[in-house]
């Protein structure tokens, strides 16, 4: 089975401290832990944490803001046509498997 959410998708956070916020997926991370496949996504402007950075010869130290991964189950794809959250489906068009939005039926490029 393919990935439901991939880099470049517009998503909505459905649970957690950033519930209701929208952003674009920067990167999708897959991790295996205790025999389970875990999938996380880094979303722009979501789950921002402060990180202390040591000073080096090339850069100054200080506190920077970084985007941390969020579990894929806590985000939903946003339909660009209707502007609401939607589920993702798969179908074959000309012997090619493509993703589509179940709410509008639009194929996701």
Curated annotation (Swiss-Prot):
Keywords: Ribonucleoprotein, Ribosomal protein, RNA-binding, rRNA-binding
Any single Gene Ontology cellular-component annotation: ribonucleoprotein complex
Any coiled-coil regions, as ranges: none
Family matches, as SUPFAM superfamilies: Translation proteins SH3-like domain
MF terms (GO), sorted A to Z: rRNA binding; structural constituent of ribosome
Matches recorded under Pfam families: KOW, ribosomal_L24
Gene3D superfamilies according to UniProt: 2.30.30.30
HAMAP family documented for this protein: Ribosomal_uL24_B (MF_01326_B)
Listed PANTHER family: MITOCHONDRIAL RIBOSOMAL PROTEIN L24
Family: Belongs to the universal ribosomal protein uL24 family.
Assembly mode: Part of the 50S ribosomal subunit.
Free-text function comment from the UniProt entry: One of two assembly initiator proteins, it binds directly to the 5'-end of the 23S rRNA, where it nucleates assembly of the 50S subunit. One of the proteins that surrounds the polypeptide exit tunnel on the outside of the subunit.
Protein name: Large ribosomal subunit protein uL24
Gene: rplX
